[in-house]
Regions:
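Long extracytoplasmic/lumenal interhelical loops at the membrane interface
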Residues: 27-51, 55-96
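Hydrophobic transmembrane alpha-helices and their immediate junctions
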Residues: 74-75, 81, 95-128
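Membrane-interface micro-motifs in multi-pass membrane enzymes
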Residues: 85-88, 93-100, 140-148
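Transmembrane alpha-helices of multi-pass inner-membrane enzymes
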Residues: 107, 124-131, 140-169
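Flexible juxtamembrane loops connecting transmembrane helices in multi-pass membrane enzymes
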Residues: 1-40
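Short acidic/histidine-centered micro-motifs embedded in hydrophobic/aromatic stretches
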Residues: 17, 61-65, 111
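Active-site/binding-pocket entry motifs
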Residues: 20-23, 68-73, 157
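Short helix-capping/hinge motifs at transmembrane helix termini and TM-loop junctions
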Residues: 136-137
């Protein structure tokens, strides 16, 4: 039955995730494991940010900074898994520094506070989706991510017609 299949798949994924975490905490290799590789990416990004807090490494030097930091840390990640931060906020701080990260956060959150009184369900749904994406991916580092964000952010911010929300809900 379909319910048993879904339940068993959820249990399998949960067991795999728990094994991944336990293996990683015990000093195991994170290579090929989505969740624990992100821990490695984030730790590496934080180390880079500590060394280049004010100005970052520059947008062109991000791959080199990560490669160098993985080598310095003797990371157990296989070379093909030594990726960037997979977090938009860390990506901004690595490339441009903490002051730019603060500006990015202000610019990102400003429309939310400005627009919250209008009660736009669609805008807030879009914004939360984009924000959550930025926590686990460097969303704005790809053409698809930039296009998605700019298109829908502009659409919902400049479209002052509340009928869209009323008709949607």
């Amino acid at each position: 039955n379909a319910d048993e299949l879904i339940e068993s798949n959820i249990h399998i994924r949960l067991r795999v995730t728990l094994w991944e975490l336990n293996n990683y905490r015990s000093g195991g290799n994170a290579s090929g494991h989505s969740l624990t590789m992100r821990f490695e990416f984030w730790q590496t990004a934080l180390q880079i940010i500590k060394q280049h807090a004010l100005t970052g490494v520059g947008t062109g030097d991000v791959p080199d900074a990560f490669a160098k930091k993985y080598d310095e840390a003797n990371s157990m990640l296989e070379t093909k898994f030594r990726l960037r931060s997979h977090n938009q906020f860390l990506a901004v701080a690595v490339a441009l520094g903490i002051p730019a990260l603060l500006l990015f956060i202000i610019v990102l959150f400003y429309p939310v506070f400005q627009y919250q009184n209008s009660g736009s369900f669609l805008y807030m749904t879009f914004w939360v989706t984009a924000f959550l994406s930025m926590l686990t991916e460097d969303t704005l580092e790809t053409q698809a991510g930039v296009s998605f964000f700019i298109f829908f952010n502009s659409l919902f911010l400049f479209l002052k017609n509340k009928e869209l929300d009323k008709n949607f809900i």
